[in-house]
Amino acid sequence: MDFAALIYHRQAFLDGQWWLPFTAQLVHFSFPHVLVNGAGAVFLYVFFHPWLRGTSQWLGLLGGWIAVAVVVIADASCGYYAGASGALQGWAAGGALAMVGASGSRWDRRRWLGLSLLLLLLLKMWLLPQMTATDLLWGAPVYQPAHWAGTVGGLLFVGMWTLGFATSQKQRADHQRAKHQ
């Protein structure tokens, strides 16, 4: 299979290949690019596994994936794109938000780890634009809007799910109280 055909190229997208903003996040520019993104995915899985259910992790990843696709399409200056880093940013940010927003009234280790991860993501996003493409292993530029979009998408998807879940739990509890009165 020619994986290069899955990379987002703006003109190919405009010519009707609507799937490219999504498939581009499954392919990479080089083997080191794959390794860095793969290592990030393994780290996130290992980091979140003891603390979170799969739902919030998948929602963070999905939110990042969709948000990256939207920003790649919306940005006329983005001529090409490949890589999972934006979607991984969504997974990281969404998972960290889920940890910070965990049920319970006290700030336990899970919440502090989630807050620390959110702060590290902000630091990374502040430092990364200061690096040039040659500073990176794969020699391709980092498309910062994808990282920002992925972060926002992960936060939005997990945040909306968390608020919806909390609201439905409160409604069920109110319903049960009303039923027993």
PLM regions: where:
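N-terminal TM1-TM2 helical hairpin plus the immediately adjacent luminal interfacial "cap"
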Residues: 1-59, 66-82, 139-146
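Alpha-helical transmembrane segments of integral membrane proteins
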Residues: 34, 59, 108-119, 145-148
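Membrane-interfacial segments
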Residues: 51-56, 79, 100-105, 165-172
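Intrinsic low-complexity, intrinsically disordered segments enriched in polar/basic residues
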Residues: 20, 44-45, 101, 109-110, ...
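Membrane-interfacial alpha-helical segments at the cytosolic side of multi-pass membrane proteins
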Residues: 35-52, 90-101, 152-165
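Multi-pass alpha-helical transmembrane bundles in non-GPCR membrane proteins
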Residues: 65, 83-131
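C-terminal transmembrane module of polytopic alpha-helical membrane proteins
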Residues: 26, 123-181
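Hydrophobic faces of alpha-helical transmembrane segments in multi-pass integral membrane proteins
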Residues: 40, 59, 63, 67, ...
